[in-house]
């Protein structure tokens, strides 16, 4: 069975470099409005690793805080300043009780979720992270279809919508699995059990099939589609059925510009043959 292993890092670890061995990486952008000091470097490396083929999929996460509007703006501004949201990246809400108000935080967590879903262009590119206690107590009302990385050291919480398991903080839990990764040393480690990197990415709303359109923004793809349709209409006529002003063939069908040019060619050839 294929499992996808990956590290989860922040400014508490050294910045990433090309010694990192896995196809997926998760990096912190901020804790509420606190800006992670390693994010700019880590995100530049991540973007470059996508382009070089070293990395398949990336997660950028924020520790979720009740000042959700300022939290969301911090995420947006930091990513935009570092080159913008790459199409191979999903955003993750790190939902933990530490330093947050007790009880149900669904209201502000979901506001943060939907704000970032608007930024990412689709809610499927927003995933969650939590242990079982915080998942069921802090985030009691959750968006439909939410994908989750479940934290459980020593056991798998198997949360609803779970696509990966954070199995250790690097201190020895699940000793048969890696307790860290270069260049970070010991750190939080995760496993998307039974999923290839591409399948894990797809589960988090990210397409990794590549192709020339991956280099285009959504606006550029829309522009390209519009122009292709305009060319089609000019060459084939409305609904591809020809242009009535060019005349009809023997079957009464409207001619396309190519048909009309062929008629002119034949007429000219006949005139020259006389």
Curated annotation (Swiss-Prot):
InterPro entries: Glycoside_hydrolase_SF (IPR017853). This is Uncharacterized protein Rv3766. The lineage of its organism: Bacteria, Bacillati, Actinomycetota, Actinomycetes, Mycobacteriales.
């Amino acid at each position: 069975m294929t499992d996808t292993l990956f590290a989860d890092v922040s400014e508490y670890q050294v910045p990433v470099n090309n010694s990192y061995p896995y196809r997926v990486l998760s990096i912190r952008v901020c804790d509420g409005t606190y800006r992670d000091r390693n994010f700019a470097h880590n995100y530049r490396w991540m973007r470059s690793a996508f382009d070089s083929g070293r990395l398949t999929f990336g997660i950028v996460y924020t520790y979720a805080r009740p000042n959700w509007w300022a939290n969301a703006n911090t995420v947006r501004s930091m990513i935009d300043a570092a080159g913008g949201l790459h199409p191979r990246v999903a955003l993750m809400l790190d939902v933990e009780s530490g330093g947050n108000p007790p009880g149900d935080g669904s209201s502000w967590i979901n506001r943060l979720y939907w704000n970032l879903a608007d930024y990412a262009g689709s809610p499927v590119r927003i995933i969650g992270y939590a242990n079982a206690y915080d998942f069921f107590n802090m985030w009691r009302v959750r968006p439909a279809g939410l994908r989750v990385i479940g934290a459980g050291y020593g056991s798998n919480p198997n949360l609803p919508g779970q696509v990966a398991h954070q199995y250790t903080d690097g201190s020895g839990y699940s000793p048969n699995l890696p307790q860290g990764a270069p260049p970070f040393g010991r750190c939080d480690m995760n496993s998307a059990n039974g999923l290839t990197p591409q399948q894990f990415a797809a589960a988090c709303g990210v397409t990794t099939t590549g192709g020339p359109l991956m280099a285009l923004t959504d606006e550029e793809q829309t522009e390209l589609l519009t122009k292709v349709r305009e060319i089609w209409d000019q060459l084939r006529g409305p609904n591809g059925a020809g242009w009535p002003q060019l005349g009809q063939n023997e079957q009464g069908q409207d001619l396309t510009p190519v048909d009309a040019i062929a008629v002119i060619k034949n007429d000219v050839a006949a005139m020259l043959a006389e």
